[in-house]
Amino acid sequence: AIHRQTLQALQQAQPTGHWVLKSPNHLWCLPALLEAYPDARIIWTHRDPAKVLPSLASLNCAMQMQFTRQLEPERVGNYWADKIERAITRAALFDSERQPGWCYHLQYKEFIADPASALATIYANFDVPMTELHAQRISAWLSQRPQHADGVHAYDPADFGWSNGSLQQRFSQYQQRYAVPIEG
């Protein structure tokens, strides 16, 4: 209840017909999320953990540097690798216990390759009509915000004591189960 009330308070100035919650943090609590929002439409985006984890660890290190001079990147990285591994394991178990179609599994690579088409597929999957106006707005938004227009987030897995191979080995079951391609 408090989650819903918080969202309602946040949107008070601009009411909307639905919310879009974008966070891997929801992987830890899918049962509670669906209990609170039984009509939720879940999109689980799958991406190579060897790309996700160094980025996540780098962002968390940048935030922590604001508060400490004793930053330990390997410790931060291992914390997040453990946390994401538990989240994926928990979410995959939940996924295996649900009926097919309870969520839409989206490959990040497919989304990046053609975002408008991926969104149209998602809408169709959930039987939500996409109006021509909506499609035009999506197209306009995408053309005004090309990927990497504001720069590229640079990071190196080695900064956190990893190699791409070590992360791919650690998350191989996830990548096999959901056909998550290894990114170059």
Regions found by a protein language model. Give the residues of each.
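Conserved phosphate-donor/acceptor-positioning beta-strand/loop module used by diverse small-molecule
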Residues: 22, 33-58
